Amino acid sequence: MIPVVIEQTSRGERSYDIYSRLLKDRIIMLTGPVEDNMANSVIAQLLFLDAQDSTKDIYLYVNTPGGSVSAGLAIVDTMNFIKADVQTIVMGMAASMGTVIASSGAKGKRFMLPNAEYMIHQPMGGTGGGTQQTDMAIAAEHLLKTRNTLEKILAENSGQSMEKVHADAERDNWMSAHETLEYGFIDEIMANNSLN
């Protein structure tokens, strides 16, 4: 159930679902698994807010276990495409594709709450049963290219070398807020809401 907010206006009462009300304040919630429908909703909100006023920051709150690489990269590409700065605030967790999205916020404006977690790892892929050997080779090559793309983004976002990111992402690598800050994925740990 989505909560409803009721506001008093000069014309009387007006009710909004909570996400529409947050959007008025340029806040987008990226929560749950990253998949095409969720990504399309986030992208539409980013484009709408940028068209509305590209001089004002957009606040992207992230709490996701990750998910689809293509859906996540569509969000990242849109964040980079629009003119407005996107501040990212990690609450709960940013794992897997979520780390790529959260670390792609505007430099100097990437935040994390004190008890949130980050997790990087190599992308997962697979082929269904009955797959031909040639298709398996194609899938394996695509997975290696995808891993290289994601590690390049993570290296650029953190300031770490590709080699370090590659080694650190070999297996699930969980980081506390302080470890995430030291790694370079975020710029500040927020104890309270001090966003401008």
Swiss-Prot record:
Compartments, record wording: Cytoplasm
PROSITE patterns found in the cross-reference section: CLP_PROTEASE_HIS (PS00382), CLP_PROTEASE_SER (PS00381)
Catalytic activity: Hydrolysis of proteins to small peptides in the presence of ATP and magnesium. alpha-casein is the usual test substrate. In the absence of ATP, only oligopeptides shorter than five residues are hydrolyzed (such as succinyl-Leu-Tyr-|-NHMec, and Leu-Tyr-Leu-|-Tyr-Trp, in which cleavage of the -Tyr-|-Leu- and -Tyr-|-Trp bonds also occurs)
List of catalytic residues: 96, 121
Key words of the record: Cytoplasm, Hydrolase, Protease, Serine protease
Endpoints of the signal sequence: none
Record GO biological process: protein quality control for misfolded or incompletely synthesized proteins
Family: Belongs to the peptidase S14 family.
Subunit structure: Fourteen ClpP subunits assemble into 2 heptameric rings which stack back to back to give a disk-like structure with a central cavity, resembling the structure of eukaryotic proteasomes.
Designated name of the protein: ATP-dependent Clp protease proteolytic subunit
Lineage: Bacteria, Bacillati, Bacillota, Bacilli, Lactobacillales
